[in-house]
């Protein structure tokens, strides 16, 4: 397949170049230039946004058709990003495609689809089992012209990436509602005043630079 050919010609041969870059202390939290070079090649080959079933934005593949391609990409740590198919961007783009306003799509979805920015999803919290959203303690308060967001998140994947510009943040908007209807999500630009990226956290001893799992 075209994807396998691309992997053989461009992805596997450049893995060492990627690791040589991030294994240097000075460049550890910067993006290896080879990634942007390979993303341009993947775009030209129309091997781009393969995960999105909507043909308007992606390749128009079903989950059944995409699954073996995801398996092939999974053979290399760097592959999914090269084809703009890496988490958490994939899930965040799907949310924006389905539920984003026209303005949100223009500002955030368009550059995500182009692969020029990255994004993060802030759900996990330090004091509760956050995979169950009913435990979330962060709050989102609707005010006249904006929202007041309060919370402490960690293991927010990709928030350390220098290209990360937007966070989808989960919090509670109505503590009096049914426990499965208390939660909402808001878009929070990472440069918003009050957003503090504290430190990278490790998983099994690895910090996953240059993307990271941030507190």
Predicted regions and their residues:
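Amphipathic, small/basic residue-rich leader segments at the start of a protein or domain
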Residues: 1-87, 94, 98, 103-111, ...
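Short, solvent-exposed loop/turn elements at beta->coil junctions and helix N-caps
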Residues: 55, 124-129, 155-157, 200-205
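Short glycine/proline-enriched turns and hinge-like loops at secondary-structure junctions
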Residues: 61-63, 131-134, 159-164, 178-182, ...
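A short, Trp-centered hydrophobic/proline-enriched beta-strand micro-motif
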Residues: 115-124, 169
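Flexible, small-/acidic-enriched active-site or ligand-binding loops
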Residues: 135, 191-215
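A structural signal for short hydrophobic beta-strand segments in well-ordered beta-sheet cores
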Residues: 138-141
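A generic structural signal for beta-strand entry/edge sites
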Residues: 144-148, 211-213
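A short core secondary-structure module
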Residues: 146, 150-198
């Amino acid at each position: 397949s075209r994807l396998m050919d691309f992997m053989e010609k461009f992805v596997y041969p450049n893995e060492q170049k990627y690791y040589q870059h991030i294994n240097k202390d000075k460049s550890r939290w910067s993006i290896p230039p080879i990634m942007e070079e390979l993303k341009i090649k993947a775009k030209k080959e129309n091997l781009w946004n393969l995960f999105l079933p909507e043909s308007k934005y992606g390749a128009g593949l079903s989950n059944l058709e995409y699954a073996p391609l995801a398996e092939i990409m999974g053979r290399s740590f760097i592959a999914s990003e090269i084809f703009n198919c890496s988490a958490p961007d994939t899930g965040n783009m799907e949310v924006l495609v389905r539920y984003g306003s026209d303005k949100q799509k223009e500002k955030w979805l368009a550059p995500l689809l182009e692969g020029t920015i990255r994004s993060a999803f802030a759900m996990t919290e330090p004091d509760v089992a956050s995979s169950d959203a009913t435990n979330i303690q962060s709050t989102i308060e609707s005010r006249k012209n904006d929202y007041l967001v309060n919370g402490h998140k960690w293991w927010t994947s990709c928030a350390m990436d220098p290209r990360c510009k937007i966070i989808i943040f989960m919090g509670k908007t109505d503590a009096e509602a049914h426990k499965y209807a208390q939660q909402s999500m808001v878009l929070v630009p990472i440069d918003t005043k009050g957003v503090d990226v504290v430190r990278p956290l490790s998983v099994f001893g690895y910090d996953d630079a240059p993307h990271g799992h941030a507190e």
